[in-house]
């Protein structure tokens, strides 16, 4: 694991218990794999609306469904509890998003929609950062995106 990743909020020291060794490169880099529901749990924890966390969740659910291995809320719940000791640290918006995605039948269309929203959010953040360099912080980014969306919807 990269040292940068271990500093993110989606990192859990329990990941090693739920991952499987895949390969070692040059006797230096260990590559490990993890079940899809654990990856979804990590994406929920990160939950960045301006990166690809939410579209990744839709994409993972879609691919697993296509492969005949649909992922249930119960599977994700188990992964969240095992990695993060519960849902307390996951934003309510992300939990609501997951529940709505699990009810969705057309995940391919939803994937495209969510991906577009993420691209727009990223563009919004970059524009705001350009105009107000010190305004955007990790703890206010969702609020900024929400205000920008409301402003755009009024137009």
Model-derived features with residue positions:
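Compositionally biased terminal segments of proteins
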Residues: 1-155
